[in-house]
Amino acid sequence: MLDPKLLRSDLPLVAERLARRGFTLDTARLEALESRRRELQTETERLQNERNTRSKAIGQAKASGEDIQPLLDEVSDLGERLDAAKARLAEVQAEWDESVAALPNLPHDSVPQGLDEADNVELHRWGTPGTFDFEVRDHVDLGAKFGYLDFEMAAKLTGSRFAVMRGPIARLHRALAQFMLDKQTREHGYEECYVPYIVNDASLTGTGQLPKFGEDLFKLEGDHDFYLIPTAEVPLTNIAREQIFTPAELPLKLTAHTPCFRSEAGAYGRDTRGMIRQHQFDKVEMVQIVDPATSYDALESMRGHAEAILQALELPYRVVTLCAGDMGFGAAKTYDLEVWLPSQETYREISSISNCEDFQARRMQARMRHPEQKKPQLVHTLNGSGLAVGRCLLAVLENCQQADGSIVIPEVLRGYMDGVERINA
């Protein structure tokens, strides 16, 4: 959520920065709501003061033996008018809050100008895409050849955009997740967490999925407002909700391996083949809760933590800085890591690392207090994939395929697979 003080003090600046995202801010509506809010606030305070004055007069009149009924009637009337003014003020405030909750984060000054992925800026590439002297198969054909990756069975069990993995491919998928967790905890200093895969609406509001993106979520039926998590970012980041940290407790670095569930409501017809876009997929998530003064250093570190996974697996990739118009709702700056897929002869997203600054923290009231400060300040929150396990699996299958259809297991994963070096057809 954006800073209400900034919205009230410099709305044109907010509108200008949001325009970089391609977002048109209805300044007239916000100005009208704020004007009405101030009027009602003033009226409420006036009526409150007037009622207090009349209430005191009742005691004085009673002590002097005067008829207090007219004063009682006046106080009663003032009370009714005050209640009505408070109700109108609450309605206007709720309308203001709803409008502000729908506003995306402001892009950082270093974010490139642009409206979509065509305007993203490549930072660098690592590794050289391999050359093959045979016809390259995609992960769907490779899985069908093995019989260990079955989309037809998944469609029978559930529907489209699901997968059944068996045997060595299921084991390779698990090995990837374990390797990622070990890398993030042992080398990069994250604390491993086990979190609920079901969260409430307050958690999703805290990280920004609600109220605007409810259609992208799987909501459970029942008396509670429960949802399947779209990413472990939601429970991990909300660990900081309504907390006040000391400087010594930060940075808080958390990681978790979870399934993620997304309706993909806006992805009809896109990436319908294979594991690129699934309703259920696994991901190792990284979250950092940090002092605002260090958040952009943390962003660079997190990018390195994600890159280290791809480098260890020897998978070619590139890093891009997302332009303002292509960033997620809560992000102030985002890097995407894109892995090379030989079957598509292009790079595809495998990790997104974002600094949300205080956007989520304001919603969650996640704060810190320096010893020299009287009031606590909002922390900054960052999140990123370290990495998407399913997409990493298909990248390994495609980049490590051999002419005979076998898959060479990356060396760093062999210890997780009892020394197996190759998956044979």
UniProtKB/Swiss-Prot annotation:
Its main location: cytoplasm. The lineage of its organism: Bacteria, Pseudomonadati, Pseudomonadota, Gammaproteobacteria, Oceanospirillales. InterPro entries: aa-tRNA-synt_IIb (IPR002314), aa-tRNA-synth_II (IPR006195), aa-tRNA-synth_II/BPL/LPL (IPR045864), Ser-tRNA-ligase_type_1 (IPR002317), Ser-tRNA-synth_1_N (IPR015866), SerRS_1_N_sf (IPR042103), SerRS_core (IPR033729), tRNA-bd_arm (IPR010978). Pathway: Aminoacyl-tRNA biosynthesis; selenocysteinyl-tRNA(Sec) biosynthesis; L-seryl-tRNA(Sec) from L-serine and tRNA(Sec): step 1/1. It is an enzyme of class 6 (ligase). Keywords: Aminoacyl-tRNA synthetase, ATP-binding, Cytoplasm, Ligase, Nucleotide-binding, Protein biosynthesis. Catalyzes the attachment of serine to tRNA(Ser). Is also able to aminoacylate tRNA(Sec) with serine, to form the misacylated tRNA L-seryl-tRNA(Sec), which will be further converted into selenocysteinyl-tRNA(Sec). Belongs to the class-II aminoacyl-tRNA synthetase family. Type-1 seryl-tRNA synthetase subfamily. This is Serine--tRNA ligase. It catalyses: tRNA(Ser) + L-serine + ATP = L-seryl-tRNA(Ser) + AMP + diphosphate + H(+); tRNA(Sec) + L-serine + ATP = L-seryl-tRNA(Sec) + AMP + diphosphate + H(+). GO terms for biological process: selenocysteine biosynthetic process; seryl-tRNA aminoacylation. Consists of two distinct domains, a catalytic core and a N-terminal extension that is involved in tRNA binding. It is found in: Cytoplasm. Homodimer. The tRNA molecule binds across the dimer.
